[in-house]
Amino acid sequence: MNRLKYILLLAILIFNSGENIAQDFLNFKGQLSAYSHFNPNNDFPWWNGGRYIPEAHVEISQKEGRLFDIEASANLYGNIGMESFSHTVSNGKIKPYRMWARYSTNQFELRAGLQKINFGSASILRPLMWFDQLDPRDPLQLTDGVWGLLGRYYFLNNANIWLWILHGNNNPKGWEMIKTNRSVPEVGGRIQFPASTGEAAISYHYRTADSRTLSDAELQFAKIPEHRVGFDAKFDWVVGCWVEASWTNMGKSMEMFTNQEIINLGVDYTFGLGNGLTVIYEQLLAAYDEKAFHLSRPATFSLINASYPLGLFDNLSFIIYFDWRNKAAYNFINWQKQFNMLTLYVMGYVNPKNYNIPLQQAAGNLFAGTGIQLMLVFNH
């Protein structure tokens, strides 16, 4: 696999450096989960499935605080949907989940391979969700990684610089509407620095998009230069507050998809009630325009998320989204119970049958309407 060159190249550089190895560490762990989901609105009302993520992690400590480590994990899953015992549909897959090698010191790290890259100040509705698709309702917080090389340098004043090169990630990531041209690498970076009582950052990413799979022949291009700029800041005052924004511009006319503008404003606060009630409020505006910042017919969402620990091993939380354009509310509630190495999740929801939450349209096929899901997770 060509993507393994990222890992092999980094490993060769490290082991040819002549450093004496001080200590080795090998760790195996895994996560096994199973769920049962019932929603009478679906074509297949009853869904059941299982997933196993085995992970191996090797650490090779070197002198002077240097570390070389490798992580490899896989994602094995299967699902079956049932209308009746005689009418079912199923799917499953085995694929790499993470596969990277990293060289790090006290202030620097270089990581190559299949990895998760995410950043930003927003909590749930994230304009800077450029390379992942984390779902806030997912107890496992799973997301596919990207193939690439990431370098980070940390200054003593808590400022840091990120630089990355991605390659071989042709499927849409995050907020992307169009695939990436697989033959052209993507590049970008981020500068994060202290600001007042918090921190702020500026991010940039460049890729070459490929729109040849679109149905409109006039919008089909093999190579479309795309520039993406992001800004985020978070401050701890009486309440925690943040702003996060992203602007994406296509170098060719893609009609209403030529420009994309997304902005999030949010606050959080923990009330001194009982064991502590944490509340998050976010406001999101997203627009697609032929002209930059025209903001014609933007989608506007409000979100409130509350979490309350019922005890040492129980937690109750809910999320409410409100779609102002369609005047629709999405309601999720989740109870979590910890049993040593086992965790039980019970989730219920009441949603519109037309599911329009940004970046959750695929999940909408399952979570549209009213339903309940049970999930059991075993970590070893």
Task: Annotate each predicted stretch with a short phrase.
Residues Q23-N41, A72, A159:
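Transmembrane beta-strand segments of Gram-negative outer membrane beta-barrel proteins
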Residues L26, E64-I70, Q107-L110, N158-I161, ...:
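Repeated loop/turn-to-beta-strand initiation elements of outer-membrane beta-barrel proteins
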Residues A34-P40, I60, A74-I80, T105-Q107, ...:
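Transmembrane beta-strands of outer-membrane beta-barrel pores
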Residues W46-P54, G92-Y97, T143-W147, S183-V187, ...:
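Residues that define the transmembrane beta-barrel architecture of outer-membrane proteins
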Residues P54-I60, R98-Y103, L149-Y153, G189-F193, ...:
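Residues on the lipid-exposed face of transmembrane beta-strands in outer-membrane beta-barrel proteins
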Residues S61-I161, L166, F193, K353:
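Outer membrane beta-barrel
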Residues A195-T197, K234-D323:
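Detector for outer-membrane/organellar transmembrane beta-barrel domains
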Residues L342-T343, Y349-V350, L366-H380:
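Outer-membrane beta-barrel "beta-signal"
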